[in-house]
Amino acid sequence: MKNHPARPRPATAVLTRTLRRRRWLQWAGACAAAAQTAGFGSGVRAQPAATSEPPRLALLIGNRDYPEGEDLPPIHKNVRDLRAALERRGFEVDQGLDLDQAAARAATAAFAAKVRAARPDATVFFYFSGHGAQVDAENLLVSARINPKARPETLVRTSMTLTRDVINELPRRPAGLTIAVIDACRTSLRDVAGGEGLNQVEAPSGCLIAFATGAGRPAIAPADESRNTFYTGSLVKLLEDASDEISFSDLFRLVKLDVQNVMLNHPVLLLRQFAQFPFIAENTQISRRLAPLPEADAATAAPAPARFASRDEAADWAALEAAVWPAEIARLATDFLKNHPKSRLSGSAEVARAGALEAADILRRRDVRLFRTAFQPAEGLPANELVKAGRGDKDAAARVARNYGRNASRFDASRYEGWLQYAAALGNGIASYELALHYRRVEQPLLAAQFESRARELGYTPPPSLDNTRK
């Protein structure tokens, strides 16, 4: 990748750049030193101080029973198989099948009460598989026995909403991890070109929301009760087969890559043409691996395998974890996979490489004005957000942008625009719309129209109130 020259700066900025570089080297060195020694030659995985794994709680809702022609045969198998996979990963699982709105809300409220009573660092997993719909920019989880093609007012009256009834119902857990998985499907290929689908959302702090397909695009379910849907089938497979060491965040990115590969190589042409590409909205604060920690009293249990097979592997992983510039991340991840093909962290390295390669390509584009200096740490700028953004995390990129926005203490229009351009290019329709509103405020109507159009292409529908303020 070519290095874009930074914009000319006054000589007084030289000292500031030097200090920033020094802070960056100190931070990266500390990260590398900690990671290099963690987990080598020992069964103990680097982890925050804890005597045992925090509770793992899950609620699975699967609605198969819809009016004739709209039923979803794979859904009950989805729930059975996912429940078994989650239980093997240490989850206590509740489930509900073919629930109407009242029953689904009651199940979710009971689950939320259980979550509130658990430790604040618990891992929480909500799953819905059934029909989904979007009305007035709101994502709806369609109740059993309701026609998903019913009038909008009927759907609103009879369905759960993803934001109000699920995400907002579950307590905020910045010290824990909340995962919501929405596998909203249909079985008919005749509807796939209709442009229908769910809306883009942003995850609250501590939360990861995974959709089976991108905003505005349908997910197709096989008309066969002996098969899983494409997304849940991949999720179950990777829950069972992935290394214990990878994080839940990386798991869902591996699922995304796997589903994309399956769809793009599917023998049915129409499925290839309208391939579902999973969508992830993430704002997690901690990293939690797939395998739970041993119980505190398990002193006689066999030790877990060492995280790294050698000091070289530990050092190479430390260097990869500390990198923030996409081209460097891609190079280090490629080298790691080449030098340590059997690493327990190879899945995480694959995720880092895929995200960084996409990010590096985007940063070469003329319509993304973001340079390497933007990835250097700065006072008050969360370093973990830069790390995520360098790996192609569209939501982290948007959060970095807002550190430079009009209401931020460090307002910098150039950085604000550049980071939002980058987030939009990574697929963040909300960031694209935010940039359109910014350009409208500063009287650049052509750019405003361009990014508003881009937001809608990405499947983002602004709420009616926000849309009205724009006009």
Feature names for model-found ranges:
Residues K2-A322, R331-N339, R364:
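Cysteine endopeptidase catalytic domains of the caspase/legumain-like
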Residues L320-V324, D361, G405-R410, R441-Q444:
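Short coil/turn linking the two alpha-helices of tandem helical-hairpin repeats
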Residues D335, R399-N407, E434-R441, D467-R470:
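Hydrophobic face of amphipathic alpha-helices that form TPR/SEL1-like repeat modules
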Residues L337-E350, R391, Y460-P462:
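Short solvent-exposed coil/turn linkers within tandem alpha-helical repeat scaffolds
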Residues R391-K394, N407, L426-G429, L458-T461:
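Short helix-capping/linker turns of helical repeat alpha-solenoids
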